[in-house]
Each structure stands twice: as structure tokens, then as C-alpha cells.
């Protein structure tokens, strides 16, 4: 099924991939992205662990409806979370792209 040394090579590749993924996860945790709503009037900065680092609100919104401002903050946070998820997927895909796996084989991590 795996050929001579195939299983050993596969295990070695899995170990290397796991190390790369650990490093990538550490890098992702350090990333920061900015989500926006209201055409940039509300900005939320989060890190790769989805922790909110900063919320910026344009002063013109402070005079408006409280409910609208709350909605804009939530929308900006959701935009930032979506951006972090996209970045994580791109970075993780780059880690696993070089690995030669048998058809149908799925990694546990």
C-alpha cells in the first residue's frame, strides 16, 4: 500500500507538517486585522486569537442612535473575525500544500 519506506516517510512528513502548523498557529496568534463597518466609521482590531485589541468610533456617530452604533460595532467585529478566518485558512493551506498524501487520507489536525 505504501511501498518501501512509504509509511516511514509519511510519518516523517506528518511530523514536519505538525511542526510547521504549530509555528503557523503561533504566527497567526500574533496577527492583527481591522474590520470595518459604516464605510469605515467604526473599526475593530482583533488578533489571531479573536481577542479584541481596539475599537475606533468616528466622533460623528456618538451623536447618533445608540442602537445603530451597537450594530456597527458588532458588524465591524464580525468583519474582522471573517478576515482573520480567511488569513488562517490561507496560511494553513500553504503548510499542507507540499505534503504528498495518499488519496482520501486526512490529517487529524
Swiss-Prot record:
Chain spans, region Disordered = 88-109
Keyword Phosphoprotein tagged: no
| Gene Ontology cellular-component terms listed | bacterial nucleoid; cytosol
Q: Name one Pfam family in it.
A: YbaB_DNA_bd
Q: Does the keyword tRNA-binding apply?
A: no
**Which superkingdom?**
Bacteria
Where is it localised?
Cytoplasm, Nucleoid
What are the record keywords, sorted?
Cytoplasm, DNA-binding
Its chief place of residence is cytoplasm
> What InterPro entries does the record point to?
YbaB-like_sf (IPR036894), YbaB/EbfC (IPR004401)
What SUPFAM superfamilies does UniProt report for this protein, alphabetically? YbaB-like (SSF82607)
MF-aspect GO terms:
DNA binding
> What does this chain do?
Binds to DNA and alters its conformation. May be involved in regulation of gene expression, nucleoid organization and DNA protection.
Report the sequence similarity comment from the record.
Answer: Belongs to the YbaB/EbfC family.
Could you describe the subunit structure of this protein?
Homodimer.
The identity of this protein, by name, is: Nucleoid-associated protein YbaB
Q: Which organism is it from?
A: Escherichia coli O139:H28 (strain E24377A / ETEC)
Amino acid at each position: 500500500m505504501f511501498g518501501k519506506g512509504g509509511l516511514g516517510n509519511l510519518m516523517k512528513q506528518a511530523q514536519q507538517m505538525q511542526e510547521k502548523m504549530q509555528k503557523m498557529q503561533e504566527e497567526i496568534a500574533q496577527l492583527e486585522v481591522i474590520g470595518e463597518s459604516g464605510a469605515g466609521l467604526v473599526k475593530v482590531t482583533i488578533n489571531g486569537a479573536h481577542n479584541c485589541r481596539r475599537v475606533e468610533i468616528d466622533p460623528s456617530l456618538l451623536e447618533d442612535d445608540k442602537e445603530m452604533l451597537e450594530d456597527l460595532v458588532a458588524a465591524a467585529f464580525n468583519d474582522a473575525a471573517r478576515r482573520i478566518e480567511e488569513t488562517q485558512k490561507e496560511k494553513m493551506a500553504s503548510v499542507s500544500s507540499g505534503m504528498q498524501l495518499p488519496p482520501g487520507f486526512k490529517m487529524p489536525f
